[in-house]
Amino acid sequence: MAARDATSGSLSEESSALDLPSACDIRDYVLQGPSQEANSEAFSSLEFHSFPYSSDVDPDTSNLNIEQNNSWTAENFWLDPAVKGQSEKEEDDGLRKSLDRFYEMFGHPQPGSANSLSASVCKCLSQKITQLRGQESQKYALRSFQMARVIFNRDGCSVLQRHSRDTHFYPLEEGSTSLDDEKPNPGLSKDITHFLLQQNVMKDL
C-alpha cells in the first residue's frame, strides 16, 4: 500500500513537472513572442494593402490622375504640328484683317478736305493697292503702299513737292535735292515716293 502511494506521488510530481514550462521556455517566449506577433501583423497588413479593391481607391488620388492626364492631353494638343499651324494661320488672318481695317479707316482724305494733291496721291495709291491686293507674293509691297497712303493723308505731300520738277513752291536748290540723300520718313518707303513721282501726280496742283 505504501509502495503504491509512493509510486502515485512520484507520477504526480513528474506530471506536474512536465506540464509546467521551464524558466528558459518562459524567457524565450517573452523575448520572441511580441516580435513574432508584430511580424505576423505586419505581414497580414502588407497582404491586405497590396491588392486594394477598386472601392478602396482614394478619390483624391483618382482626381489627381485625371487632371494629370488632361494636362498631358492639352500639352500634346498644342504640340501637334497640324493644330499649331492652324492656330498660327488663324492668328495671322485676324491680324491681317485688323491691319486692313486700320489702313482703310485712316488712308482716305477726311471729309471736307480741300487738298487736291492729297486727293490725287490717295487716288493713285488706292489704284495700286487694288492691283496688289490678293497677291500672296506682294504682301510687303501692299503694306508699304497702304502705310504710305496713311502717312500722306496725315502729313501732307511735302516730300513730293520738294522732289517734283513741276513744283514752284521751293527754291531750285531745295527742289533738286536727291531723294536718296534725304533723311527717310518713318514708315514711308523711298520706293513709294519714286513711284509717285514717276506717275506725275504733281500736275494736279
Swiss-Prot record:
Biological process, per Gene Ontology: DNA repair; negative regulation of double-strand break repair via homologous recombination; positive regulation of double-strand break repair via nonhomologous end joining; positive regulation of isotype switching; somatic diversification of immunoglobulins involved in immune response; telomere maintenance in response to DNA damage
Annotated TM spans: none
Taxonomic superkingdom: Eukaryota
UniProt keyword annotations, A-Z: Chromosome, DNA damage, DNA repair
GO cellular component, as recorded: chromatin; chromosome; site of double-strand break
Subcellular location: Chromosome
Cysteines engaged in disulfide bonds, as pairs: none
InterPro entries: SHLD1, SHLD1_C
Pfam families, per the entry: SHLD1_C
Main location: nucleus
Function: Component of the shieldin complex, which plays an important role in repair of DNA double-stranded breaks (DSBs). During G1 and S phase of the cell cycle, the complex functions downstream of TP53BP1 to promote non-homologous end joining (NHEJ) and suppress DNA end resection. Mediates various NHEJ-dependent processes including immunoglobulin class-switch recombination, and fusion of unprotected telomeres.
Additional comment: In BRCA1-deficient cells, function of the shieldin complex is necessary for sensitivity to the PARP inhibitor olaparib.
Subunit structure: Component of the shieldin complex, consisting of SHLD1, SHLD2, SHLD3 and MAD2L2/REV7. Within the complex, SHLD2 forms a scaffold which interacts with a SHLD3-MAD2L2 subcomplex via its N-terminus, and with SHLD1 via its C-terminus. Interacts with ASTE1.
Protein's UniProt name: Shieldin complex subunit 1
Naturally occurring in which organism (per UniProt): Homo sapiens (Human)
